[in-house]
């Protein structure tokens, strides 16, 4: 289960490595997140957040997260 802090991090934390380095997690392409699910999410908080981002995208709930972005 996720915590509300996870939602804020999804909206603001940037991908630290890879093809989409620097992109906010909730804005990562679904195909990229599906690839991670197939290969295995990274361990720790980043993996948890990537899995959560995928679930929000699959359910079409990205619009719930985007208002939490801090300018």
Where would I find each of the regions flagged by the language model?
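DEDD superfamily 3′-5′ metal-dependent exonuclease/proofreading module
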Residues: 1-71
């Amino acid at each position: 289960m996720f915590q509300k802090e996870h939602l804020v991090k999804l909206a603001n934390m940037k991908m630290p490595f890879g093809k989409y380095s620097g992109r906010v997690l909730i804005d990562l392409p679904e195909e990229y997140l599906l690839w991670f699910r197939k290969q295995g999410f990274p361990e720790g908080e980043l993996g948890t957040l990537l899995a959560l981002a995928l679930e929000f995208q699959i359910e079409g709930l990205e619009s719930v997260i985007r208002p939490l972005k801090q300018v």
